[in-house]
């Protein structure tokens, strides 16, 4: 290895001082920060507030200081159907309810993976990966689908938010600590020669402790509840006592198995028009993990537009922090000129595939597509997005995505499989999925707070 010499430093300093633009950039950046100094005013003006195709949603939701964006996005697609079916002004499903069961199922998933890797070295990559974040808040559509098929949904009034659902950090920290100690006990007991049957008895007791911790933090999830909905004209639209599973079946009108995950990963190890899954990624054991069909970006746009034109919102996952004006709610590759600020390629140094390969980008956040604009030739130009950061964020709680930003940073959408071509549908339903490593970027979990 070669160290940095003082001659190297002197040369770098001379290079900096040789261009007045560097000094101007330094003065702006040290005062305002990188993103504000790189902000392009025209980036805001390029994003109008009207849309050619648009679905109308209820009041904006707020995940607060939790990583439940994937749950909020999923529930926002559900509540849209409820609002439309019963002619409601607005409505909200409980986000604390699926959080409870997700933590319960992830804990079980983690301990099952520990039992399945007893012969793996503790300091090996696989076990180290499993121990890194056993029950984080993040997730994907297939994981949410598994939760709903097993546990249903409830109105927010049936299981309201708590301090720990609004801010999951402390609960997650203590549950993670407990699960890591449980993993230690299971591995050490196995090393001592105990049978798998004995280990499973230990795990059963551990899961009772997990349940106790979750009820303490989130409250008891309802087994049944009364629900009454009034429409915009104050007429009683729904009244009765339901289980969570009955409430989903009665109000949402959605076959969960019809909605599938489409990804767009242009890396060499993932040829397009094939199916993929991720090893050891999931939550509900009987849910079967995740399954994707990998298509090119133009196909993701075609599918999303088709569903929006049928007046249905679209769940999607993206790398939200890239080229993002958070206060204005604008995601646009023209919004920030970081390369111009520094005078060399930074944001433009890697293409979409290279960013995935070199760890620069992956899916970090899930939201909902609510609308789209087209140019004179029918090409998409701008997308309306329902976020879950409250009404004071962005433009009254919604964001916009430029079409070039979609090209670069949208990685996953969820659509009704009826919009696929016959060839695409056959591939998704019949092809044996290629198994990706647990740490593959397509296994990232939408979790941004």
Predicted regions and their residues:
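Long, positively charged binding patches that form subdomain-scale interaction surfaces
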Residues: 289-364
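Conserved catalytic-core surface of thiol
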Residues: 375-449
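Short, glycine-/Ser/Thr-/acidic-enriched flexible segments
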Residues: 76, 321-323, 372-374, 390, ...
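Generic recognition of flexible, low-complexity loop/linker segments
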Residues: 290-292, 300-306, 354-359, 368-375, ...
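Catalytic nucleophile-His microenvironment captured as a short glycine-rich beta-strand/loop
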Residues: 69, 148, 357-390
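N-terminal regions that are enriched for targeting/export leaders
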Residues: 2-58
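Active-site nucleophile-adjacent alpha helix/oxyanion-hole segment immediately C-terminal to the catalytic cysteine
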Residues: 44-314, 393-396, 403, 411
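Short His-Asn-centered micro-motif
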Residues: 72, 316-319, 370
């Amino acid at each position: 290895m070669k160290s940095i010499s003082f001659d190297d430093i002197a040369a770098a300093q001379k290079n900096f001082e040789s261009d007045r633009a560097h000094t101007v950039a330094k003065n702006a950046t040290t005062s305002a920060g990188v993103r504000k100094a790189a902000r392009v005013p025209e980036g805001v003006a390029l994003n109008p507030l009207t849309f050619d195709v648009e679905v109308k949603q209820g009041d904006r939701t707020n995940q607060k200081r939790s990583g439940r964006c994937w749950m909020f996005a999923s529930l926002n697609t559900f509540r849209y159907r409820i609002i439309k079916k019963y002619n409601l002004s607005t409505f909200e499903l409980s986000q604390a309810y699926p959080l409870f069961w997700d933590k319960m199922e992830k804990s079980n998933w983690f301990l099952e993976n520990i039992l399945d890797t007893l012969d793996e070295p503790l300091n090996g990559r696989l076990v180290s990966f499993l121990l890194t974040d056993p029950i984080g808040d993040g997730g994907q559509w297939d994981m949410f689908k598994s939760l709903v098929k097993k546990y249903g949904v409830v109105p927010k009034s049936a299981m309201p938010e708590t301090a720990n659902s609004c801010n999951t950090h402390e609960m997650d920290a203590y549950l993670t600590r407990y699960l890591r100690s449980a993993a230690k006990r299971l591995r050490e007991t196995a090393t001592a020669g105990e049978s798998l049957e004995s280990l499973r008895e230990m795990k059963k007791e551990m899961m009772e402790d997990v349940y106790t911790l979750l009820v303490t933090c989130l409250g008891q999830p309802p087994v049944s509840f009364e629900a009454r909905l009034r429409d915009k004209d104050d007429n009683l639209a729904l009244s009765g006592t339901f289980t969570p599973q009955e409430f989903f079946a009665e109000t949402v009108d959605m076959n969960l198995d019809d909605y599938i995950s489409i990804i767009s990963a242009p890396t060499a190890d993932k040829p397009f028009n094939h199916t993929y899954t991720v090893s050891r990624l999931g939550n509900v054991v009987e849910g079967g993990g995740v399954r994707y069909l990998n298509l090119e970006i133009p196909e993701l746009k075609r599918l999303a537009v088709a569903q929006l034109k049928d007046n249905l919102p679209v769940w999607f996952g993206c790398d939200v922090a890239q080229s993002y004006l958070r206060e204005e709610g604008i995601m646009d590759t023209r919004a920030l000129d970081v390369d111009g600020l520094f005078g060399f390629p930074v944001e433009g140094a890697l293409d979409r595939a290279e960013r995935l390969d070199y760890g620069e980008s992956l899916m970090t956040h899930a939201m909902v597509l609510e609308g789209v604009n087209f140019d004179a030739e029918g090409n998409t130009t701008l997308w309306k997005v329902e976020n879950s950061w409250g009404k004071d964020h962005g433009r009254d709680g919604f964001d916009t995505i430029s079409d070039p930003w979609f090209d670069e940073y949208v990685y996953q959408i969820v659509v009704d499989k009826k919009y696929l071509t016959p060839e695409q549908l056959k591939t998704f339903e019949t092809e044996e999925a290629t198994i990706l490593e647990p740490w593959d970027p397509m296994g990232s979990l939408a979790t941004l707070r």
